[in-house]
Amino acid sequence: MRLPAPIADAYGVAIRCLIVDDNNLFLDAATELLAREGLEVVGTATTSADAIRRAEELRPDVTLVDIDLGYEDGFELAEALSDRVAADSSVILVSTHSEEEFGELIAASPALGFIAKTQISARAIRELLDAG
């Protein structure tokens, strides 16, 4: 079985992704799916503190952040990541909820955009990065 070519930026470098979610089953499934589609998943985190530490350490091109991180707020994490991580890193919010439920909060956040968890793919991420 042939693996897909890595999903790359404009310079041909594979896109590096950090995934933040409090659900380990989702982390495993998303990691496997995105890696199979050619994205380089460089790490995962289950809490805001861990996400900030991992983002500073790993310097991903994009961080997928669950809006509902258990007792934590994904919107606050998106703000913190934007403030603390280099400007060349983007945040994309994800959720099992629809974009319409959080439309105003998503628009007001520093996140590049939103992808429903059921729609996560390397292509959807690439499209948001290209549009951003």
What residue spans do the PLM features occupy?
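Non-catalytic signal-transmission and effector/linker regions of two-component phosphorelay proteins
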Residues: 1-16, 120-132
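Short amphipathic alpha-helix used as the core "switch/output" element in two-component signaling
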Residues: 75-87
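Two-component/phosphorelay signaling modules centered on CheY-like receiver
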Residues: 24-43
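Active-site residues of response regulator receiver
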Residues: 66
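Hydrophobic/aromatic residues positioned on beta-strands within the core alpha/beta folds
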Residues: 93-95
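The feature encodes the CheY-like receiver
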Residues: 70
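Acidic catalytic/metal-coordinating carboxylates
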Residues: 47-50, 73-76
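As written
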Residues: 74, 106-113
